[in-house]
UniProtKB/Swiss-Prot annotation:
Similarity comment: family membership: Belongs to the protein kinase superfamily. Ser/Thr protein kinase family.
Signal peptide: none
EC number(s) stated in the UniProt entry for this protein: 2.7.11.1
Disulfide pattern: none
UniProt keyword Kinase, yes or no: yes
Domain Protein kinase residue range list: 39-306
Cytoplasmic side stretches: 1-555
Main localisation: plastid
Residues the entry annotates as binding ATP: 45-53, 74
Protein name (database record): Protein KINASE OF THE OUTER CHLOROPLAST MEMBRANE 1
Function: Serine/threonine protein kinase acting as a regulatory component of the plastid protein import machinery by phosphorylating import receptors (e.g. the A-domain of TOC159, TOC120 and TOC132). Supports preprotein import and contributes to efficient chloroplast biogenesis, thus being required for survival during de-etiolation.
Assembly information from the UniProt record: Associates with the TOC complex containing, at least, translocons at the chloroplast envelope (e.g. TOCs and TICs such as TOC159, TOC75, TOC33 and TIC56).
């Protein structure tokens, strides 16, 4: 392919490459589309799941100047004709929104060469991965890690503010400028091509590099959604690699990494020699539930504090937050709680414990914030809440409260009032709701968060770990494979985990594990119903539900029944034996005895005892 493209270009002419970048092509209102005749491919410098990276020369010429610049071209693999316009529009939107971002690679424009869409960007001499490869041990010093980390977190935050996910964070995608500043080299191509059919049907390759992928990236439609905190995982992996010089999950295949990260939920080993605030930050980046990970704003705050030699101050802050987490935040991480800040006149209520279906202690059933004792952004602050029927405001720690807007709060189970797209589940989990009622919801079947308004939602039944569920009677073909009992009856399972999009992981303790059927199953919350002793009608159903708790219940009860029958039989036999012995000694006849002739005219009689 390369030789074919280069063979068709005109002969090279002598020119001088100008150092630096002309801003003329980046002026406001300038179209990002570049004429392919101004681009001359030189040689390929890289290859990835979406296409090849080429070193090229861009020729700009007007009446006032004639310039040539070295550029890097990301040439995408062929895209279907009916999707080309969609892709071009996405990249033009990206181009317009990324102008002026200091920590993101400079985009020059969009073009098409031999029918392939190309993203043209400034050429950088090397990457952070290249620099690490040249160092002894392949790792960076802590000051360098913090410095580069601040640069990169700033760039990621800039792209997040424009609504883009990166999904492919790794040292080889972190470019270095002439003044040794880390630049974000991937502008979120996996995210932009998420719904575009490509030659490769392997979703793993399309959504990032396995060694740096978050759990939800492997199956975003099922274990998603992907959100900004998905990039926190990849960023954490990159920081660990900078500190250790070892690639995450080095030497493992994609299938092995999937088994470790998604199924077994194992986390990367974090160096113990780093400052506690950084260690705590990295542990947060590797939380399985993306809602419990730090946002890029939190990451940038911690890195800047460490970089400015304020480690002791940060340590005190983090430690105090850990105490609050264990005593007052009901199982939520400090990163989860830091994503929303209370303001005066907010409606609030007590926060229910994590993985619980109901509030255990409603100190504040519902009230209004009337005062802030400290800065609202302080995770250890207190607020004054006015509760109906209570004269004086209550002084409550912010970590035990959640903001309520239009009757909804983050973490609530919701259902779409009108389901327009049948491909995704109508039941999901609310991830965020702002004060204007704009919502973001995770649904099975959608790789990213669904955006809408609270008026489109209604409350749904709550599911939590430990509950038993079964498929509804009207479900003929479930979304996911489900266990069956004998005679083809759907089995009842127990929820072992609730994923961020409402997908339920279910195991079947009432079924004896055998072969490939052993392990967890998945369920759509819209297709199941809760089973407990209150919902069971009659003794038979209650006994059947008792068997759902463990496969050993039935054999245990059978064994106990047999043992009881044996003991009863032995007792009866002994009693009969004692009764016979007594009758033979005294020759008396008790009630229920019948005298039967022996049939031979003898005076002797035989006694038959009925028992």
């Amino acid at each position: 392919m390369a030789s074919k493209i280069i063979a068709g270009k005109p002969d090279d002419t002598e020119y001088e490459i100008i150092e630096g970048e002309s801003e003329s092509a980046l002026a406001a209102g300038t179209s990002p589309w570049m004429n392919s005749s101004t681009l001359k491919l030189r040689h390929r410098i890289g290859r990835g799941p979406f296409g090849d990276v080429w070193l090229a020369t861009h020729h700009q010429s007007t009446e006032d100047y004639d310039e040539h610049h070295e550029v890097a071209i990301k040439m995408l693999y062929p895209i279907k004709e009916d999707q080309r316009r969609v892709v071009v529009d996405k990249f033009e939107d990206l181009f317009s929104k990324c102008q002026g971002l200091e920590n993101v690679c400079l985009l020059r424009g969009v073009s098409s060469i031999n029918g392939k869409i190309c993203v043209v960007m400034k050429f950088y001499e090397g990457s952070l991965g290249d620099k690490m490869a040249r160092l002894k041990g392949g790792k960076l010093s802590l000051p360098d890690v913090l410095r580069y980390g601040v640069d990169l977190a700033t760039g990621i935050l800039e792209l997040h503010s424009k609504g883009f996910l990166i999904l492919n964070l790794k040292p080889s995608n972190f470019l270095l400028s002439d003044n040794d500043k880390a630049i974000l080299g991937d502008v979120g191509i996996p995210y932009l091509l998420l719904s575009i059919p490509l030659p490769s049907s392997d979703m793993t390759e399309r959504l990032g590099t396995p060694n740096y992928m978050a759990p939800e990236q492997w199956q975003p439609d099922v274990r998603g959604p992907m959100s900004f905190e998905t990039d926190s995982w990849g960023f954490g992996c990159s920081i660990v690699e900078m500190l250790t010089g070892v690639q995450p999950w080095s030497g493992r295949s994609a299938d092995e990494i999937y088994d470790l990260v998604v199924r077994k939920q194992e986390k990367l080993s974090i160096p113990s020699s780093i400052p506690p605030p950084l260690e705590n930050l990295l542990r947060g980046c590797f939380m399985y539930d993306l809602r419990s990970r730090p946002s890029m704003t939190d990451i940038l705050l911690v890195l800047k504090s460490l970089q400015n030699s304020e480690e002791e101050q940060v340590r005190r802050g983090i430690d105090s937050r850990e105490i609050r987490k264990s005593s007052a935040t009901l199982g939520y991480t400090e990163w989860f709680l830091s994503k929303d800040h209370l303001q005066v006149r907010d409606t609030v209520r007590s926060r229910k414990p994590a993985n619980s279906c109901k509030h255990e202690n409603m100190d504040v059933p519902e009230g209004m914030v009337v005062g802030l004792e400290r800065d609202s952004t302080d995770p250890d602050g207190f607020v004054l809440v006015k509760v109906h029927g209570v004269h004086d405001p209550l002084r409550v720690h912010v970590s035990v409260l959640e903001r309520v807007t239009n009757g909804l709060a983050s973490g609530d189970w919701v259902r779409l009032k009108v389901r327009k797209d049948k491909r995704h589940s109508p039941v999901g989990v609310l991830h965020s709701i702002d004060r204007e009622g704009n919502v973001a919801v995770g649904f099975i079947g959608l790789p990213t968060l669904w955006k809408g308004t609270s008026s489109q939602l209604q409350m749904a039944k709550v599911y939590s770990v430990g509950q038993f569920v079964k498929l509804k009677a009207n479900v003929v073909i479930p979304r996911f494979k489900w266990m069956r009992k004998g005679r083809g009856i759907w089995a009842t399972g127990r929820i072992s985990q609730v994923l961020p999009n409402g997908c339920l992981e279910v195991d079947f303790p009432g079924m004896l594990p055998f072969g490939e059927e052993h392990g967890s199953y998945l369920a759509d919350p819209a297709e199941v119903e809760i089973v407990n002793f209150n919902t069971c009608q009659g003794a038979v159903e209650k006994y059947q539900h008792l068997e759902d708790f463990h496969w050993a219940v039935r054999p245990l009860l059978i064994a106990m029944g047999l043992l009881t029958a044996m003991k009863l039989g032995i007792c009866v036999r002994k009693k009969i034996g004692r009764s016979k012995d007594g009758k033979q000694r005294d020759g008396s006849t008790g009630q229920g005895d019948c005298k039967i002739p022996d049939g031979k005219g003898s005076d002797k009689s035989k006694w038959l005892v009925f028992f």
